From Swiss-Prot:
SMART domains: RRM
Biased composition annotated in UniProt, kind: Gly residues: 207-218, 334-373
Name of the protein in its database record: Heterogeneous nuclear ribonucleoprotein A3 homolog 1
CDD domains (alphabetical): RRM1_hnRNPA_like, RRM2_hnRNPA3
Originating species: Xenopus laevis
Amino acid sequence: MPRGGMDDHWPSSDDQGHDPKEPEQLRKLFIGGLSFETTDDSLREHFEQWGKLTDCVVMRDPQTKRSRGFGFVTYSCVEEVDASMSARPHKVDGRVVEPKRAVSREDSARPGAHLTVKKIFVGGIKEDTEEYHLRDYSESYGKIETIEVMEDRQSGKKRGFAFVTFDDHDTVDKIVVQKYHTINGHNCEVKKALSKQEMQTASAQRGRGGGGSNFMGRGGNYGGGDGGNFGRGGGGGFGNRGGYGGGGGRGGGGYGGGGDGYNGFGGDGGNYGGGPGYGGRGYGGSPGYGNQGGGYGGGGGGYDGYNESGNFGGGNYNDFGNYGGQQQSNYGPMKGGSFSGRSSGGSGSGPYGGGYGSGGGGGGGGSYGGRRF
């Protein structure tokens, strides 16, 4: 297929010729806001100042060959990516551009994947995990502003999750793009922390993409169909009424549940994390956050139940850390492809994923307890 075609935008999972510890997704930057005069050569000339580029492309309309206003550069190692991001702001052909770490195909389908935020949600916090464990881990990615370990106001017991706010959105992008996180010896989920308003924005943006052009393939349709379902249709999706991850979710609210979950800010249950608490009776399955019975991504729903079997790779997120079962899938955006359903160079909120560059911050509100450090 010619350079810049639709299907060659996605790398192979083995990422041949490079250290497997540094998959292509981690070495790739999305460059938004390009001048329509910018070419592959002028883009390369600028960004190769910070390292060796293994690929560089300005995305163009396949019919008119006109620039879509964005492109991608891929470095030979993550260290070069970090150096490039540390050199912001970047100006190419007289225009200030916006570099962001590329988002994988599966992550692009998740709420807020392209929103710009400085706060992360950390799930799976165990009772023996203290603030300094979170700080030690998070400081390796960037400068921390605050850490909030969420607790039950009455008992003082940890709720099982925390929030970390950094001074730079790129630190958040860097940490969430990685698939595995182990804090104080425990497997943890790390994702962007979105306010209720940001969740609504993300849902609306995915809804505009709608239909069969989204990333989840058959039946996924986040933001469209039945109430913005993040999963295979039906009730109980992300932000719907039953648990966190799709058709069989439990917990009467759960993470993101109807009115009393993570983005319910107090709601009916009055707790930040839903009536039975974060991971209560079914954060993606029956009991608990990652217990072997259902677990994170367990059968029948789970987190990101967007393939036909209704789970992410068929594996549990349990103490053995088999997140997604066998191996990571696509390593992230390559040349070409439709990022926001109907078009990849769309107007309004941005050309990439229909939502890059929006908003900031997250969390807040709700009748929960927490210690801020």
